[in-house]
């Protein structure tokens, strides 16, 4: 194999690992109504199941992801896939709230192990094409997250919850066996690689990149918490909800890598700052539009913009990371993103219930613009200081 062929093979295996991990994590969202009907759980119990996965992903990204910078990248991915499979099996065999929370927590931890290591390794395969590689990773992450609920909703009915979770657990096992014989390039390691992620906050360029990724990703928490209810209030149904997720995710799968290729020739921070403007306006439009089919078209357009903005944000993190801290930086970014999504998911339903759709989406749009604006000001100060 030539060097390029090796890099391509490495990337494909990393992408498969990400897809298996993401889909194992997201399939639970297709099972929530089934769990509630079967076990008569309150809404708070469902929130506890879902929230445990987010919390575990956050903690693992902060404290375990830096191990990839010490030569353990492949092991973290393997362990992550193993946890995705184990958690899925526990969920399939469970029959109590405590067991479901345990299974969800284990599956959630798999993201904290797999995602930062894959992102760091993908960017490291060819640093001159890091945004292109990270775009491909972002596309596969979204593809996995969308596929989990879509496929799960199709097979839960005829085959049941147990079979559904076992199938996604089996996919993680297949990915584990496929990547295990492969030798991936190791990440650069220095004496700084022994440190935890937190100390990266002292670096100005890292702070800018973190704030930018927060602006890009925190609205996801609002959409996760509200989207199904929002469309239902407009007269949509479950099929429409699934279709909007599919339409939104399709541009990531098709265009993220190509967008990343263009971003490699530009400033990723500038790309994010420019795209924040139309994204904020589109977010406001959701609160104005009353037709689900029109929202479907807006979602497609937003998906195209986000498929460009996400690789740029990930590339900004990769470029800001010091030598030997690639996975730690990606883990810190992931933890910040999850925290922002958790806050948005907690607050948005309250605003929606009290003030309605327009105020909710307008508030989120203002939040996106304000956070990105803060990052832009900090970036300009960094440029002036560098001169």
Where are these regions (language model features)?
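Helix-loop boundary and gating motifs at the non-cytosolic
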Residues: 6-54, 207, 217-234
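Cytoplasmic helix-loop-helix junction between adjacent transmembrane helices
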Residues: 103-141
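Central cavity-lining transmembrane alpha-helices of secondary-active solute carriers
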Residues: 51-64, 246-255
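Paired small-residue
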Residues: 98-106, 293-301
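Structural signature of the two symmetry-related core transmembrane helices
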Residues: 75-89, 270-284
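Juxtamembrane intracellular "pre-TM" segments in multi-pass secondary transporters
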Residues: 1-8, 183-210
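A late C-terminal transmembrane helix in Major Facilitator Superfamily
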Residues: 324-354
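Helix-to-loop junctions at the C-terminal end of transmembrane segments
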Residues: 60-72, 255-267, 352
């Amino acid at each position: 194999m030539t060097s390029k062929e090796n890099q391509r093979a490495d990337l494909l295996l990393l992408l498969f690992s990400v897809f298996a991990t993401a889909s194992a994590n997201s399939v639970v969202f297709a099972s929530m109504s089934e769990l509630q009907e079967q076990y008569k759980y309150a809404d708070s119990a469902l929130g506890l199941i879902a929230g445990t996965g987010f919390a575990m992903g956050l903690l693992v990204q902060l404290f375990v992801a830096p191990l990839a910078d010490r030569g353990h990248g492949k092991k973290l991915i393997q362990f992550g896939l193993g946890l995705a499979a184990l958690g899925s099996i526990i969920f399939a065999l469970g029959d109590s709230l405590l067991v479901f929370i345990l299974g969800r927590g284990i599956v959630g931890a798999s993201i904290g192990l797999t995602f930062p290591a894959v992102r760091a390794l993908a960017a490291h395969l060819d640093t001159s094409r890091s945004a292109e590689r990270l775009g491909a990773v972002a596309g596969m992450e979204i593809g996995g997250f969308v596929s989990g609920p879509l496929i799960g909703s199709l097979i839960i009915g005829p085959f049941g919850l147990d079979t559904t979770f076992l199938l996604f657990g089996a996919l993680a096992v297949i990915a584990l066996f496929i990547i295990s014989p492969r030798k991936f390039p190791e990440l650069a390691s220095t004496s700084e690689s022994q440190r935890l992620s937190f100390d990266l906050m002292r670096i100005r360029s890292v702070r800018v990149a973190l704030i930018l990724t927060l602006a890009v990703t925190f609205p996801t928490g609002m959409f996760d918490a509200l989207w199904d209810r929002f469309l239902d209030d407009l007269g949509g149904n479950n099929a429409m909800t699934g279709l909007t997720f599919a339409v939104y995710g399709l541009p990531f799968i098709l265009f993220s890598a190509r967008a990343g290729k263009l971003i490699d020739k530009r400033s990723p921070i500038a790309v994010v700052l420019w795209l924040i403007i139309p994204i904020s306006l589109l977010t406001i439009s959701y609160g104005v539009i009353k037709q689900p089919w029109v929202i479907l078209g807006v979602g497609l357009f937003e998906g195209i913009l986000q498929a460009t903005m996400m690789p740029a944000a990930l590339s900004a993190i990769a470029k800001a990371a010091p030598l030997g801290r690639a996975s730690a930086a990606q883990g810190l970014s992931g933890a910040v993103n999850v925290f922002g999504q958790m806050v948005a998911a907690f607050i948005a339903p309250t605003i929606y219930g009290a003030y309605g759709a327009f105020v909710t989406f307008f508030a989120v749009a203002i939040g996106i613009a304000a956070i990105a604006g803060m990052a832009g000001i900090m970036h300009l100060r960094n440029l002036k200081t560098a001169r």
